[in-house]
Amino acid sequence: MNIEHLSHWSGQLNREMYLNRYGHAGIPVVVFASSGGSHNEYYDFCMIDACAQFIEEGRVQFFTLSSVDSDSWLCNWKNPHDRAEMHRAYERYVIEEAIPFIKHKTGWFDPMMTTGCSMGAYHALNFFLQHPDVFNKVIALSGVYDARFFVGDFGGDEAIYQNSPSDYIWNQNDGWFIDRYRQAEIIVCTGLGAWEQDGLPSFYKLKEAFDHKNIPAWFAEWGHDVAHDWEWWRKQMPYFLGQMYL
């Protein structure tokens, strides 16, 4: 398997940003880390091994990104608005710097896939919903999609609202976005077992919104034995990759 350890300077974040590439061909899959995770996390927890068949066949290539969650949503000493603004800087990094970097490395100029587990699932779905021209496939595993989970009640703060998918999706009526959502492959999965309860309200709220707007998506509920843990994500990710058009 081709493995590359990469980095590039981010003017948006004013720091060196690290990312890894796993694979040599196929659609790029942009991976967001879980809470406090690094660009090495996906490999360290054997997610790359779990998806090795798809990688070695040249159907997908994974790009695992660095996170700034400790400076944004998880930075409890900052006020909620400043945490959202730091996330916005990260969004600009991903869209304006990381994605062009990946395009240059791969020669892939079509829309990409995005994925993540836990907090990475929040990022994956949020980035897809905000940028359906950049991403047209998403696999979100065990996420919480309500920004209140990170910052509490945010009132009318627009910067936070625009990054709370289970809220803003209800008011997304722009045909440009809706058309792209309807053409995409969307998988949102949760277990019903240990440590999954925090994500269930926003999971069901999202499902209701997608149904209301006639956006085709697979909201998959796995069993009461399925916990919020890597053991299950290693099973879910290759299963769902196998259901996608690659």
Predicted region positions:
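Non-catalytic cap/lid and distal C-terminal segments of serine-dependent acyl enzymes
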Residues: 1-246
